[in-house]
């Protein structure tokens, strides 16, 4: 089967705003008397804003202290902090090798999609000047389930009009790898410590079209 689509996660694959998310969550958590560190922040990668908040409240033993309206307000304020910090994002924030890979995929006439749980994904792609490379971006606001559920990757495949079996998914988080595998796509992991990735690369610098092409032909 010919490779028809490549679907990217955003944070940690195309750019790295994890530190901005962490700073925003850390401030919100501190305001309600919860301390979180960088190690705990690893458990928030690849999941939705609401699920991140739930885990923070659970971590601090305060899961029952906030009703749905109060939780929504906390999540809203976190997003305001995060969006404010995105003003420092420029084209230089694209991770190494990604822009050239996107150009190569376009030259090969392979559809490119985005499967990010971030509601700010369109804003980020625009700031990075990458929007033109993406045929379809899954709308996180329309999803019922967060990763590791495969819903977002299946939505991206549907948006591209290609079957999951003809796609590669690229992720840097365990929840994302699990979601890709559950969708029936081929999985590529970026970074160490990811289990189940069918191809594991140390960084985006190793993520090239020749490498993806060879991987596809050998699976």
Swiss-Prot record:
Keyword annotations from UniProtKB, A to Z: Carbohydrate metabolism, Cytoplasm, Isomerase, Magnesium, Metal-binding, Phosphoprotein
Active site: 9 (nucleophile), 11 (proton donor/acceptor)
EC code(s) of this entry: 5.4.2.6
Binding site for beta-D-glucose 6-phosphate: 11, 46-47, 49, 118, 120
Positions with a binding annotation for Mg(2+): 9, 11, 172
Cofactors (names): Mg(2+)
Modified residue annotations for 4-aspartylphosphate: 9
GO terms of biological process kind: carbohydrate metabolic process; DNA damage response; DNA-mediated transformation; response to antibiotic
Cystine pairings recorded for this chain: none
GO cellular component, one term: cytoplasm
Subcellular localization, as worded in the UniProt entry: Cytoplasm
Main localization (coarse): cytoplasm
Entry comment on modification after translation: Autophosphorylated.
Keyword field contains Magnesium: yes
Record flagged with keyword Magnesium: yes
Cofactor binding description: Binds 1 magnesium ion per subunit.
Summary of the knockout phenotype: Cells lacking this gene are only slightly more susceptible to nalidixic acid, but are more sensitive to UV irradiation than the wild-type. No visible phenotype when grown on glucose.
Recorded superkingdom: Bacteria
Catalyzed chemical reaction(s): beta-D-glucose 1-phosphate = beta-D-glucose 6-phosphate
Miscellaneous: The catalysis proceeds via a phosphoenzyme formed by reaction of an active-site nucleophile with the cofactor glucose 1,6-diphosphate (G1,6-diP). The phosphorylated mutase binds either G1P or G6P and transfers the phosphoryl group to the C(6)OH or C(1)OH, respectively.
Family label: Belongs to the HAD-like hydrolase superfamily. CbbY/CbbZ/Gph/YieH family.
Cited function: Catalyzes the conversion of beta D-glucose 1-phosphate (G1P) to D-glucose 6-phosphate (G6P), forming beta-D-glucose 1,6-(bis)phosphate (beta-G16P) as an intermediate. Phosphatase activity with the reaction intermediate beta-G16P has been measured. In vitro interconverts beta D-glucose 1-phosphate, beta-D-allose 1-phosphate, beta-D-galactose 1-phosphate and beta-D-mannose 1-phosphate to their corresponding sugar 6-phosphate product.
Name assigned to this protein: Beta-phosphoglucomutase
Organism: Escherichia coli (strain K12)
Originating gene: ycjU
